[in-house]
Amino acid sequence: MRKLNFISGNKVTLLHCGADYFSKILSEIDLATHEIYLETYIFANDKTSALVKAALNRAAARGVKVRVIVDWVGTGDKHSDVLVREFTQAGVECRRFNPWFRRGLARTHRKICVIDSRVALVGGLNIIDDLVSDDGSGLVLEFPRWDFAVHIEGDLVAHIFLEIKTQWLRLGKMNLLTRFKLIRNLRQSARSSAPLAMQAALVVRDNLRNRATIQRAYLHALGLARKRAILATPYFAPGGKFRRALISAANRGVDVTLLIGVGQFSLQDAVTNSFYPKLFAHGIKIVEYQKTQLHAKVAVIDHEWATVGSSNFDGLSLFVNQEANIVIRNQAFADALTTYLEQGIAEGHPVDPKEYANQAWYRRIWYGIAYFVYRGLMRIATLGSYT
């Protein structure tokens, strides 16, 4: 998947925060008749995750093949081990991604669920209550975590199913030749049918054929931007190519706005702040979202290109971890997402370039040190790919 493969014949519905997402995923799991694949970074131990777990167990009890992938770091060593045992007892197959870093540094940061090859859900939401902080602190949030996912029906589902089943096979113990044959057969089975209005593409990042696919999707869209680009992310620390693409768009007269989550990790906030002066110098607007945890990884460009997914705009997501985004070319969908983004901007705090320039000298030094440390760590983790 080295370039975007837009598939026609889809209905893509935007889901906002946990209220929309968990209601939809639970109802779809209860409708499952054949098989369910679920991949997530965090599968927490709380009331919301218990509901999902119970629904998966019920599905297995009625004969549905249920397969779950959880990340070893995101879910935790002890809890993921407990999940594997409890799921196995209930007839659910569960695999942990990259325990003890046996496959290198990469984590699966993807959030994908495919049910009966009929519907798929892809986005930024983990299996965790969205009123509980996702950093392990147990902090109760005043407002639900701000995040998005999409519910997909149509031809693209076959391609998403191919991706998650291939991931499952990669984590198995079968020999390389058998695995290759199964994956090849799956790829041949993913076909498109009748064209409909809504076009969408699955864009993944891995450390095989798709090392820069998500970044290239953003660079291409920003390169074609004419009027407006709104991008939201909890962590902003992209490489030089991404930053230059934002600046180039702004220099062409594109109205570029970044909606950035702050307040969760002080080091990450400092790294993000280190980029502000150059962005301000080219007219890019920055809004910090502080109402609750911003976890959304979404963007809209020119009211016709939109993306929702798991990939942050930082070194780990763009250069190390496994990620999954959906890109949609549809004005109605883009406008719906724009409405939410404009609401987030209205609720956020616009950073004034003049006020920022008047910050104390020691803060600016701290931002520079934070970036120097972050850049060094990312260059090691990415073998020099992060610039």
Predicted segments with their positions:
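Charged, low-complexity intrinsically disordered terminal segments
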Residues: 1-387
